[in-house]
Amino acid sequence: MKRWLWALPLGVALSSCNKEAGEGGRAEIRGRLLEKQVFVSGQIAVGPYALLDEKVHIVYGDGADGAFSDDDVDSGPNGEFRFPWLRKGTYTIYAIGDSYTAPSGKVAVSVTVTTDDRKSVVDIGDLIIDKIP
């Protein structure tokens, strides 16, 4: 019996190491931010084209904390963005665009993705937001 007593604390320690989504892993989420300019009528004026220096946000996990942004990055010259060093888990990526119908005049365009293993690279493709000229 004494021989196996050391296994109890080890078992408790290992079972409590369930890491949640967030920084600290080797997974990555990447994509490209594009904008299209839209008239009041809903017709597209210009675009979509790459959007430079615009904030792209990430929410770690299921957003149970009210979906506040956990981190953000600025889009690069070709609209590209990336969130490196993530753990396995669920993430929501979003950017804020303009809207004629929302009372605030702004709307979030989002996509929810899952990194399936600790080294996965998830490309969400193009995230397209509207801008009012």
What are the residue ranges of the model-derived segments?
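Sec-dependent signal peptide recognition
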Residues: 2-7
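A short tyrosine-centered beta-strand micro-motif
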Residues: 89-93
